[in-house]
C-alpha cells in the first residue's frame, strides 16, 4: 500500500467551489481540544500570547484571531449540515493555498486523479493531525512546530505521539510511506511508523555541493506539488515508479539510496 505525506500551507481559504466535502478528519476530538487550548491562551495571556505562539506580525495577528474565533469544531458528520460551519468548511486540498498546492493544481484534475489523491494522500496538520484531501477543514493557524503545551504533552509532537503514524500506516498493512513533507511535519510521523512500514523520502535539488543536493525551500515546495500531481496522473501504486518522475527534475541515482530518492533540476544536470 502506497501512502504519501505532505505538509500543509500557512495560507488557507474557505474555498467556495463545486468540490464536495467527503467526511471529516480522523481526530476531531483532538482538534477540538487544541482549539480550546488556543482560546485558553487568549483568555489567560491576551492576544500577545497567541502572537508569540503563532510567530506572526502585528498585521497578521488580527486576521489570525478572526480565524480562531470563527472556527467551529466539527465532532461528527452531521455538523457539516450546520450552515455556520458549512460556509467555513472546504475540502482540505482546496483549502490550502500555498506554492505546493498551486503546483499540484487539484482543481483541474479529473475524477480518477482526484480519487487517487483521496486514497493515497495524507496532508499533515498541527491542528487536525492528518487529513485526507477531501476531508472537511476550516481555516486555522497552528504549525506543527509551535510550542503549544497541552495536557501532559509539552508540544504538538508529544500531543500527537504515534496517532498519525497509526492512521497513515496501520501495523500489519506493509505500507510504503512516500515522504514529501518538510522536516517539521515529517518528524510527527516517521519516528512512530510500525516495523513493517517502509519510508522513501524525496529530495529536490537545484544543484550539488560537496556531494549533497542544494535544496531551496520555494523550489522544493513547487516540486513536491508537481510530484503529487504526476503520481495522480500516472495512478502510481508502486514506489519503484517514482524514479520516472520527470517534471522539471530528473532522478539522480548517484546521490540516492533505497530510502532517499534525489531529483535534480534538469537545468543543473
What are these regions (language model features)?
Residues 104-269:
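Internal, well-folded beta-alpha domain core
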Residues 2-108:
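Active-site helix-to-loop segments that bind/position phosphate- or nucleotide-bearing substrates
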Amino acid at each position: 500500500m502506497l501512502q504519501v505525506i505532505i505538509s500543509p500551507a500557512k495560507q488557507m481559504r474557505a474555498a467556495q467551489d463545486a468540490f464536495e466535502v467527503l467526511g471529516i478528519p480522523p481526530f476531531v476530538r483532538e482538534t477540538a481540544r487544541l482549539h480550546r487550548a488556543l482560546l485558553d491562551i487568549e483568555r489567560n495571556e491576551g492576544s500577545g500570547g497567541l502572537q508569540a505562539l503563532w510567530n506572526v506580525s502585528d498585521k497578521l495577528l488580527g486576521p489570525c484571531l478572526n480565524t480562531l474565533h470563527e472556527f467551529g469544531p466539527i465532532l461528527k458528520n452531521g455538523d457539516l449540515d450546520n450552515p455556520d460551519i458549512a460556509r467555513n468548511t472546504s475540502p482540505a486540498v482546496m483549502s490550502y493555498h500555498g506554492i505546493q498546492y498551486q503546483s499540484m493544481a487539484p482543481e483541474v484534475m479529473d475524477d480518477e486523479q482526484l480519487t487517487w489523491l483521496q486514497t493515497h494522500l495524507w496532508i499533515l496538520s498541527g491542528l487536525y493531525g492528518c487529513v485526507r484531501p477531501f476531508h472537511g477543514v476550516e481555516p486555522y493557524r497552528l504549525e506543527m512546530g509551535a510550542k503549544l503545551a497541552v495536557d501532559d504533552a509539552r508540544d504538538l509532537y508529544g500531543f500527537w505521539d504515534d496517532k498519525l503514524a497509526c492512521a497513515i500506516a496501520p501495523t500489519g498493512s506493509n505500507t510504503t510511506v512516500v515522504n514529501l513533507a518538510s522536516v517539521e511535519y515529517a518528524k510527527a510521523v516517521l519516528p512512530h511508523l510500525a516495523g513493517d512500514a517502509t519510508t522513501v523520502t524525496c529530495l529536490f535539488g537545484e544543484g550539488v555541493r560537496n556531494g549533497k543536493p542544494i535544496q531551496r525551500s520555494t523550489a522544493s515546495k513547487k516540486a513536491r506539488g508537481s510530484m503529487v500531481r504526476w503520481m495522480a496522473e500516472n495512478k502510481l501504486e508502486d514506489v519503484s515508479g517514482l524514479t520516472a518522475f520527470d517534471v522539471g527534475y530528473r532522478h539522480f541515482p548517484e546521490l540516492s539510496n533505497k530510502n532517499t530518492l534525489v531529483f535534480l533540476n534538469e537545468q543543473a544536470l
